[in-house]
Structure formats: structure tokens, C-alpha cells
Amino acid sequence: MDVEQFVGQCWDVLHGEGTPLEGCPLEESDAQAEAQRRFPNKPHCLIRQWSRITLECEPETLAYLASVGLRAAVIFAHQVVFDSANRCPPGSWIRSTYEVSWDMAGFFESKHTVYVLLGPGVQKTAPLRAVLAIH
């Protein structure tokens, strides 16, 4: 793959179209309270303009992730609304680590954080290499 193709893949991760999904229907304060109730021992991050990205990766990578309780998917968001651990200021972007759980109610859990997916978002698929290049 040449550089132009790789840059195109990275652009698609950030700005490409995907299948529309609805996020958490709750207001921000209610969503924050629900995250604390459902995941009391994890920091939470409320986000908007998000994508749930299923990663295209080698079978060995999929097997390894499954063996440690993870799935080949991440969240990318263009807008952090609130981060309970104060890692990201409001308005910044964020990319999660691998998925532990996800439900259609708008809660995506990674190993260390719960992401509350506010408003509409998209589901897309992208190569692992392109997603990991965004940091």
C-alpha cells in the first residue's frame, strides 16, 4: 500500500461515512448519573460526533483480543463533552482502547473507561493500522 492510500484510509476513519446509529437518549446529567450507576468503579467520558469502528485485523489478533476479554472495536469521537477523570478537556477528540462491552443504549466500555455515546453516531469498519495511526 502506498502513502496516498494509507492517508485515504486514515481520512475515512476520521471523516468517512458510516451506518447511522443512535446513541444514549438521555440528557447529559442523566447520562452521567447512569454511567456512574452502571459502572461505579470506572471513569466515564461523555462524547458526541462519535464513530464505533470495527477493526479489520489478522485472525491472530482477533484470537488474542478474545483471549484477554476484548473485542476488535474502538470508539473515535470528535467532541468530548465531559471526562470524569479530567484527561481530556471539553471539545477535544478522543480514541478509545479496545472494546470490553457495548450496548445499543449508548454505553461503550473499554478496559479503563466507559464512553457515553450522546446523540447520533455511525458504525464503520476500518483497518487496524489506520485507526492506530490516529493519536
Tell what function each PLM region has:
Residues 105-119:
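Amphipathic alpha-helical packing elements
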